[in-house]
Amino acid sequence: MRGKQPKRNKDNASVKRNYRCVGYPDCNMSFNRTEHLARHIRKHTGEKPFQCNICLKFFSRIDNLRQHQSSVHSDVDLMSLRRLQQSANSTANDPNATRMFPQLRPYGIVVQPAPVPYNLPISTPASPQDTISLYAPPYFPHPMPSAPIPLPHQPPPLPIYSYMQPLFLNHTPIQNHNIVELPPDSSDTPASPSKVQSFDQAKDASPNAKK
C-alpha cells in the first residue's frame, strides 16, 4: 500500500522559486525552472517559435503543438513526414539536386531546383560565323599568327552537264528534215551519196514507176 506523501510547505515552495519575471511591472510571477520562465515570457512577447510542419501554424508552446497535431492531423503519418522533410532539406542543400518532391506540396514543403551554373546558347538558325562566336576560342600555349593562313589553290569544280552531254549536241543540226535514206543493196557496201534523195523527189517519182 502506498504511503502518504508529506504535505508541501508553502514557505519552502516560495523559497525555491528563484526565477522571477522581470521587465513587466504588472507581473510578479516566479518559477522554479528556467524553461518555465521562458515559456511565460512568450506570453508577454507574443513569440510563437513552434510551427506545425503540416499546416504551417505557429504555437508558443511545444505541448500545444503536439496536441494540435494529434487532434487535427491525426490521419497523417508524422514519422514518414519527418523523413520526407529531412530528405527534402538534404536535397535542397545539394547544389546538384534538381528533383522536386510532389508528395510534399500538400504540406507546404517545396524543394526548389538548383540554378544552372551557366547559360546555354539558344539554338537559333544562324550563320557558321555566328555559331562559332557563341563559344570561347580554343586555348593554345603558343602565340598564333594574326594573319590568316593561305589555303592551297583548288581548281574550280567541273560543270555537272560536262559528262552528261550527248554526243550529237557537238555536231551542227541538220537543216533539211525531209531527207530520207534508201534501203541498202544486197552488198554490205555503204550507201553512196547519189542514192540519197529528198522526200519530195521520191514522192514525184513514185507514179512514174507505176506507169
From Swiss-Prot:
<dbReference type="GO" id="GO:0005829">
    <property type="term" value="C:cytosol"/>
</dbReference>
<keyword id="KW-0539">Nucleus</keyword>
<keyword id="KW-0805">Transcription regulation</keyword>
<dbReference type="GO" id="GO:0005634">
    <property type="term" value="C:nucleus"/>
</dbReference>
<keyword id="KW-0238">DNA-binding</keyword>
<dbReference type="GO" id="GO:0000785">
    <property type="term" value="C:chromatin"/>
</dbReference>
<dbReference type="Pfam" id="PF00096">
    <property type="entry name" value="zf-C2H2"/>
</dbReference>
<keyword id="KW-0479">Metal-binding</keyword>
<keyword id="KW-0677">Repeat</keyword>
<feature type="short sequence motif" description="Nuclear localization signal">
    <location>
        <begin position="6"/>
        <end position="11"/>
    </location>
</feature>
<dbReference type="GO" id="GO:0008270">
    <property type="term" value="F:zinc ion binding"/>
</dbReference>
<feature type="zinc finger region" description="C2H2-type 1">
    <location>
        <begin position="19"/>
        <end position="44"/>
    </location>
</feature>
<keyword id="KW-0678">Repressor</keyword>
<dbReference type="GO" id="GO:0000978">
    <property type="term" value="F:RNA polymerase II cis-regulatory region sequence-specific DNA binding"/>
</dbReference>
<dbReference type="InterPro" id="IPR013087">
    <property type="entry name" value="Znf_C2H2_type"/>
</dbReference>
<dbReference type="GO" id="GO:0045944">
    <property type="term" value="P:positive regulation of transcription by RNA polymerase II"/>
</dbReference>
<dbReference type="InterPro" id="IPR036236">
    <property type="entry name" value="Znf_C2H2_sf"/>
</dbReference>
<keyword id="KW-0804">Transcription</keyword>
<dbReference type="InterPro" id="IPR051059">
    <property type="entry name" value="VerF-like"/>
</dbReference>
<feature type="region of interest" description="Disordered">
    <location>
        <begin position="178"/>
        <end position="211"/>
    </location>
</feature>
<keyword id="KW-0863">Zinc-finger</keyword>
<dbReference type="GO" id="GO:0000981">
    <property type="term" value="F:DNA-binding transcription factor activity, RNA polymerase II-specific"/>
</dbReference>
<keyword id="KW-0862">Zinc</keyword>
<feature type="compositionally biased region" description="Low complexity">
    <location>
        <begin position="183"/>
        <end position="194"/>
    </location>
</feature>
<protein>
    <recommendedName>
        <fullName>Probable transcription repressor protein RGM1</fullName>
    </recommendedName>
</protein>
<feature type="zinc finger region" description="C2H2-type 2">
    <location>
        <begin position="50"/>
        <end position="73"/>
    </location>
</feature>
